[in-house]
Amino acid sequence: MARSAYLALYRHVGAPLRWDQRLKMPATELDALLAGESLHLYVLRDVSGEALGFCEFDRGAFPQIELKNFGLVPQAQGRGLGPWLLATALQGEWRSNPDRIWLHTDEWDHPAARSVYERAGFRVFDERDEPADPL
């Protein structure tokens, strides 16, 4: 996926959730990440080809895989698409037989996120308070 398309989708999904990590990355670093082998990206599209959401996995520490980003654009939320996208993406990742697939979340995540993660098989491993990055 081209950087401009990725960032447009990242912004559309992530703005309400205060996502900013990829926006802070230098362009060359993001280009390398998008072109590299360690990033697996699953994009949900409607029949016209418009991106409705995505799952992004970091396989750089395989056999552990981290779910780095997951979400839907606001107009696609509440229609059951999130659980379907996550389940489909996880099926793809489990095919490579990782030891585990994990994620971390925070209080800025979508209110339904934790229940979606739990229904997909994720369980709480650790909870901690961390200082927030200044805006």
Region roles according to the model:
Residues 1-22:
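Short amphipathic alpha-helix that is part of the acyltransferase structural core
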Residues 69-72, 78-93, 114-119:
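Conserved acetyl-CoA-binding loop-helix of GNAT-fold acetyltransferases
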Residues 118-135:
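Active-site/acyl-donor-binding loops of N-acyltransferases
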Residues 40, 99, 123:
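Short acidic/polar active-site loop segments enriched in Thr and Asp
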